[in-house]
């Protein structure tokens, strides 16, 4: 007999049939379906945060505060940062502040505060500034532009 495509078959025992669990006693894996005795572990899973009947953490700890989603977050920098990093007559932009490592994040808004002294005329472009910082810059002949 020659071996032909229609004559081929698997060796007996090479392919096992899939057990369909929980489909009656006659199927061999009925009733408890290989999960042992009845109880919590037989069922699906316990919900997230469940502590076995003990009062869970999110109910033990009191509610406190809230998060203001309208809050504007600024990365702050001071006049002392500008004094040490810029020359007379330079233009200070958010990009140059980031490149000179004054600002840690590129896309966050920035606010200029008045800590330190300024001895140079600078043109500063920023998102926000304090009134004291504005006065110190304008005293030296500089300008502040709001982005």
From Swiss-Prot:
Q: Which GO terms describe its molecular function?
A: rRNA binding; structural constituent of ribosome
A Gene Ontology cellular component where this protein is annotated is:
cytosolic large ribosomal subunit
Give the SUPFAM superfamilies listed for this entry.
Ribosomal proteins L15p and L18e
All disulfide bonds of the chain are none
State the superkingdom.
Bacteria
Q: Where is this region: Disordered?
A: 1-46
GO terms (BP aspect):
translation
For this UniProt record, give its keywords in alphabetical order, as a comma-separated list. Answer: Ribonucleoprotein, Ribosomal protein, RNA-binding, rRNA-binding
Compositionally biased residues, Basic residues: 16-28
Subunit and interaction comment: Part of the 50S ribosomal subunit.
Q: Write down the PANTHER family for this protein, in alphabetical order.
A: 50S RIBOSOMAL PROTEIN L15 (PTHR12934), LARGE RIBOSOMAL SUBUNIT PROTEIN UL15M (PTHR12934:SF11)
What this chain does, per the record? Binds to the 23S rRNA.
Q: What family does this belong to?
A: Belongs to the universal ribosomal protein uL15 family.
Protein name per its UniProtKB record: Large ribosomal subunit protein uL15
> What is the scientific name of the source organism?
Mesomycoplasma hyopneumoniae (strain 7448) (Mycoplasma hyopneumoniae)
């Amino acid at each position: 007999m020659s071996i032909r495509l229609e004559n081929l078959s698997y060796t007996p025992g090479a392919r096992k049939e899939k057990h369909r669990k929980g489909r009656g006693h006659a199927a061999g894996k009925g009733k408890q379906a290989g999960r042992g005795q009845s109880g919590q572990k037989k069922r699906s899973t316990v919900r997230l945060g469940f502590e076995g009947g003990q009062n869970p953490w999110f109910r033990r700890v009191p509610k406190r505060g809230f998060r203001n989603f309208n809050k504007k977050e600024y990365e702050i920098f001071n006049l002392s940062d500008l004094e040490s990093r810029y020359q007379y007559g330079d233009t200070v932009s958010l990009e140059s502040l980031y490149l000179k490592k004054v600002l840690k994040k590129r896309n966050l808004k920035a606010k200029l505060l008045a800590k330190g002294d300024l001895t140079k005329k600078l043109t500063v472009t920023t998102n926000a500034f304090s009134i004291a910082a504005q006065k110190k810059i304008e005293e030296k002949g500089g300008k502040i532009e709001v982005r």
